[in-house]
Design a protein with these regions (language model features):
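C-terminal helical cap(s) of enzyme catalytic domains, especially alpha/beta-barrels
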Residues: 106-110, 133, 148-163
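Catalytic alpha/beta core domains of metabolic enzymes, predominantly
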Residues: 104, 108-109, 115-118, 124-125, ...
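Glycine/Thr-rich beta-alpha phosphate-binding loop at enzyme active sites
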Residues: 80-105
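Glycine-enriched alpha-helix->loop->beta-strand junction motifs that scaffold or abut catalytic
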Residues: 12-15, 34-40, 60-64, 81-88, ...
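Catalytic cores of alpha/beta
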Residues: 24-36, 72-82, 119, 123-142, ...
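Glycine-rich phosphate-binding active-site loops on the catalytic face of alpha/beta enzymes
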Residues: 31-51, 88-97, 137-155
Length: 163
């Protein structure tokens, strides 16, 4: 999306927002702060461990949270080695776009319980959320399901019904 969308959303809501983008330069972190984001997404598939560590340090200096996204064991290990306090597991394989929400339940076992754990992508039902919560997931990122829903408020109510 466009940067202005993040600013418009921040002007309209009183809850934290995330810049869910392909952060590939530290400039984008400063830009996220100026746009009003509370958090940025750092994708381990795009960034090596040292870069994640450096970007996370910039986030800390700016008062931003960093959600470090992983899809597999190696990426989760990189996120943790970089000092991530919040790890997101993308259930969508970015190489072939297949989705498996059990990716989150499998990788949850590798992430210490004192690290916030977020399941991302492929979450469609309240039952999906209940299964993830029972596996120790602390939060979910829901994108496509909400974007495709004609009645977003009702869809969110249904998803929250089991949590």
């Amino acid at each position: 999306g466009e940067d202005r969308f993040l600013r418009e959303i921040n002007d309209a809501v009183q809850i934290p927002t995330i810049r869910k983008d392909f952060i590939i330069d530290e400039y984008m972190i400063y830009e996220a702060k100026l746009l009003g984001a509370s958090c940025v997404l750092l994708i381990a598939a795009l960034l090596d461990t040292e870069t994640i560590r450096q970007y996370k340090a910039i986030c800390d200096q700016l008062g931003l949270s960093a959600l470090v996204e992983a899809h597999d064991e190696a990426e989760a290990a990189s996120a943790l080695a970089a000092g991530a306090r919040m790890v997101g597991v993308n259930n969508r394989n970015l190489k072939d776009f297949t989705v498996d929400i059990h990716n989150s339940t499998r990788l949850r076992e590798l992430v210490p319980r004192n690290v916030l754990f977020v399941a991302e992508s492929g979450i469609k039902t309240a039952e999906d959320i209940a299964e993830l919560v029972s596996a120790g997931v602390n939060g979910v990122l829901i994108g496509e399901t909400s974007m495709r829903s004609p009645d977003k408020a009702r869809m969110l109510d249904e998803l929250r019904s089991r949590v």
